[in-house]
């Protein structure tokens, strides 16, 4: 990962800037969250199922709303994120709400070697029951083989990995979904200057960001290589979030690309089990 350290540093700076905007945005609606609202969506709640009494490692957790929502569902949670501003905010909210989640500021690629998981009983020795990640995650990672290795390492045998994220086809398109702009396959780093953020496109921030596209074959082969047997795979024509341009909301509350009549997938989910 040494070749990507400058990329990771740029992305960390960007997410620190984003966090300052996101925490006060209507998109995240932190006030409602503090007043008992869950940030989780129907998809992950139904597909992952009951987490009560289970240990859960949340990779790329941002400022931890989903981590804490899983804690409210009865899981013992650890959230990890690259942004120190996001993790500091997560710790503050967690303490304010008197929840039991733990938060670590780290690049997920460092977790295995740096042993940064808190030494809570059973975590290091037996692994986690669940590793969870969702919505805008793996595009920030250059190496999915290493990613899957980390997931497998921290799962106990029989443990579940779950991801809900935006569809690889979506990342091929320009911002208005009018033309193909990027490669479907992970051919090279995508480096761009970004203005604003998805919660407020007019926010007065600019950042250099580095992303990587990943095909389904890359995702699936990485999981299978590291002993993660895929048990469920779903694709969806909608997004639960209004986080892209040119979307419209349906009667079901979900967001779809205007004018495409659900011709294009917008997200997917995978559940895999670590083989004994």
Model-based region annotation:
Residues 1-52, 65, 69, 160-197:
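Conserved class I S-adenosyl-L-methionine
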Residues 112-131:
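A short acidic, Gly/Pro-enriched loop at the edge of an enzyme's catalytic core
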Residues 129-145:
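A short SAM/SAH-binding and catalytic strip from SAM-dependent methyltransferases
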Residues 145-160:
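A short glycine-rich, Lys/Arg-flanked "PGG" loop and its adjoining helix->strand segment in the class I
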Residues 226-228, 253-276:
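Core SAM-dependent methyltransferase catalytic element
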